[in-house]
Amino acid sequence: MSTEDLYQEDVEMLDDYEDPSTEQHWSEEDGEPSGYATAEPDDHAAQEEQDEPPALDSLALDLTLRCGELRLTLAELRRLDAGTILEVTGISPGHATLCHGEQVVAEGELVDVEGRLGLQITRLVTRS
C-alpha cells in the first residue's frame, strides 16, 4: 500500500466524520449561531497557522524520474553489451516525467546542473 493510498483513506474517513461538537445551532431570534463567541476569524491565530509549516511537510517521499520506456525480447536483453544504443520511443530527447509510484507529479526537461543531472519543471500535474 502506498503513502498515497493511506492519505486517500484518511481523507475519505475525514469526509465521512461529523463531529457533533462542531455543529452550529442557529438562534431564530438573531440569525446567528449560538454557542460561539464570534463568527469573525482570529487574525492573529490565522497568521500563526500560516507561519508554521504543516505537520506533514517533513514527510519524505520516494519519487521516480522517468525518461521513457522500451520493450526488449529476452534474446535482445542477453545480447546487450557496453556501447549498445537502445532506442526509446514515445518521448522527445531531454524530456522526463516525475512520478510518485504510478502517479505523475510533473513533467520537465533534463538539464545539466554543475555536472549533475537535473530536471527543470515545465508542467505541474494538477489533481482533480
UniProtKB/Swiss-Prot annotation:
Annotated region (Dimer-dimer interface), positions in chain: 78-81
Site entry (Dimer-dimer interface), positions: 87, 112, 114, 120
Highest taxon of the lineage: Bacteria
Localization annotation: Cytoplasm
GO cellular component: bacterial-type flagellum basal body; cytoplasm
Biased composition (Acidic residues): 1-21
Region (HrcQb-C), start-end ranges: 50-128
Family, as annotated: Belongs to the FliN/MopA/SpaO family.
Record comment regarding domains: The HrcQb-C domain interacts with the HrcQa C-terminal domain.
Subunit text: Homotetramer. The four monomers assemble into two tightly bound homodimers. Interacts with HrcQa.
Task performed by this protein: Component of the type III secretion system, which is required for effector protein delivery, parasitism, and pathogenicity. Probably participates in the formation of a C-ring-like assembly along with HrcQa.
Designated name of the protein: Type III secretion protein HrcQb
Originating organism: Pseudomonas savastanoi pv. phaseolicola
